[in-house]
Amino acid sequence: MSDSFCPDCKKHTEVAFDHSAGDTVCTECGLVLEAHSVDETSEWRTFANESSDNDPVRVGGPTNPLLTDGGLSTVIAKPNGAQGEFLSSSLGRWQNRGSNPDRSLILAFRTIANMADRLGLVATIKDRANEIYKKVEDLKSIRGRNQDAILAACLYIACRQEDRPRTVKEICSVANGATKKEIGRAKEFIVKQLEVEMGQSMEMGTIHAGDFLRRFCSTLGMNNQAVKAAQEAVQRSEELDIRRSPISIAAAVIYMITQLSDDKKPLKDISLATGVAEGTIRNSYKDLYPYASRLIPNTYAKEEDLKNLCTP
């Protein structure tokens, strides 16, 4: 339910949606506020085909404003039976011969959706990545470039812009063979192209160590007390002049916190969970070590407990 202004009640009230009739109804007085509205989302009901074991839906997906026809094109089905198969295959050939300017876009959007699903990303990030790709594709400047790297870079930029950043290594793990270097180059290319087109710098969003911390801690199976201590330590680290990448700082803080825990984590495991090299974690830890008493909350470890930390 949601709220809407009811002219009879003279106030905002909760409204109910009658999907079968397309009506929006006030729950307090029963007034129909809107009638015969069109639901453009995908239909959830299915209707079984009596002649087969399939259970197809009657309609396709929701409209997509990035496609020429809104994604509402007609698809020729293939019925059972010898005569039907001959007819449908002939029609299908004619349909495939017809020009579809959105075919490459549909394939690109499908690839982006698959990558996003594998990373557990929300729909808003998928939509933003689709928008970025559509803008770049319209500029006709990506022909001849590594398509997998371009799509992965669009997803990386979308994560940054939606304040849900992922590391390049995480994006690379679902990028269908594109390397970190290729994705990095594609990202720089896309940003440059769009900045030239817009005539202004492209907002990418600022990365903080805390953006990655909870996900890394979850991967390592850290308890809630250790996670909270790590989050507070990361926040305090922003007050210091530590010239390391946010990902490296997050990894070093985890290394520091787990040393003071009963459930210690080997440096190798932290490296695998964060994607940061062991040597880089050691160097970042070396920079953080002198500030351990300022970083680690007293509720997690006392001053004398800090002596248990490894000397870098």
From Swiss-Prot:
Q: Note the InterPro entries from the entry.
A: Cyclin-like_dom, Cyclin-like_sf, TFIIB, TFIIB_CS, TFIIB_cyclin, Znf_TFIIB
SUPFAM superfamilies registered for this protein in UniProt: Cyclin-like, Zinc beta-ribbon
Its subcellular locations are:
Nucleus
Q: Which family does it belong to?
A: Belongs to the TFIIB family.
Question: Can you cite a GO biological process for this protein?
Answer: transcription preinitiation complex assembly
| Name the record gives this protein | Transcription initiation factor IIB
What's in the keyword line of the UniProt record?
A: Metal-binding, Nucleus, Repeat, Transcription, Transcription regulation, Zinc, Zinc-finger
> Is the keyword Zinc in the record?
yes
Q: What residues bind Zn(2+), as annotated?
A: 6, 9, 26, 29
> Where would I find the sequence repeats?
115-192, 216-290
Q: Source species, please? A: Oryza sativa subsp. japonica
| Chain ranges of zinc fingers (TFIIB-type) | 2-34
> What biological function has been recorded for the protein in this entry?
General factor that plays a major role in the activation of eukaryotic genes transcribed by RNA polymerase II.
Summary of subunit composition and partner proteins: Associates with TFIID-IIA (DA complex) to form TFIID-IIA-IIB (DAB-complex) which is then recognized by polymerase II. Interacts with TBP2.
The SS bond pairs are: none
- Gene3D superfamilies according to UniProt: 1.10.472.170, Cyclin-like
Matches recorded under CDD domains: CYCLIN_TFIIB_rpt1 (cd20551)
What cellular component GO annotations does this protein have? nucleus; transcription preinitiation complex
Instruction: Name the domain of life this protein comes from.
Output: Eukaryota
The record's section on PROSITE patterns has:
TFIIB (PS00782), ZF_TFIIB (PS51134)
Q: Which GO terms describe its molecular function?
A: RNA polymerase II general transcription initiation factor activity; TBP-class protein binding; zinc ion binding
